[in-house]
Amino acid sequence: MSEPEKLTKSKDVIAYLAEQFPDCFTIKGDAKPLKIGIFEDLAKRLEDDDKVSKTRLRTALRHYTNSWRYLYSVKTGAQRVNLDGEQVEAVTEEHQQHAQETLKESKAKVAEKNKATNKAAAKKAPAKDKPENTAKAKPKTAKKPAKPKVKLADVELNKLSVGQQVQVKAGNTPMSATVLELDKDDVQVQLQNGLIMKVKADKIFLRA
């Protein structure tokens, strides 16, 4: 009898959890606040499950609870649920505040990333033809000093670790990302805008 194929991607692990515990985890729609310490419950329930390792489980759970959809669900008075969907305790004001701060920081990073992307796109766009004669010459504005380019340094795959902050080279613009998983020659990362992607090790750099 062949062994079941192990789940290596956080997305697949979350889908599997939603399948095994539908009253607790969801992959779309409103999320439910999870019981504090639910990882221990998961590890115990899936102790004999060869499809999911504890390491993958922990990474997937962190990814799930840091998603905007989940952070929106953490509101004062909302009931946290266990793996069977049973209400166990209410979300405190302190926990809601922490969730809101995390959400605010995440949105700010995405906005900053989009702003940088738009600036880069504007620089690459061809300049429009200017009319030969203009009624009034516009006053020249002082040029802003150019931002220093980020210096990148190569990094070996075996020197990377889950949770490490890295730079991903996509085109000419390096993007900040967090390492989620390491798999042979590939590295799964989460960009600041929340997008999860898998890239080759030669696309991963560190700030010099």
UniProtKB/Swiss-Prot annotation:
It is found in: Cytoplasm. SMART domains: ProQ. This is RNA chaperone ProQ. Its main location: cytoplasm. SUPFAM superfamilies: FinO-like. The gene is proQ. One of its GO terms (cellular component) is cytosol. PANTHER family: RNA CHAPERONE PROQ. InterPro entries: ProQ, ProQ/FinO, ProQ/FinO_sf, ProQ_C. Belongs to the ProQ family. It comes from Idiomarina loihiensis (strain ATCC BAA-735 / DSM 15497 / L2-TR). Coiled coil: none annotated. RNA chaperone with significant RNA binding, RNA strand exchange and RNA duplexing activities. One of its GO terms (biological process) is post-transcriptional regulation of gene expression. Keywords: Chaperone, Cytoplasm, RNA-binding. Residues 99-149 are annotated as: Disordered. Residues 99-115, 126-135 have a biased composition (Basic and acidic residues).
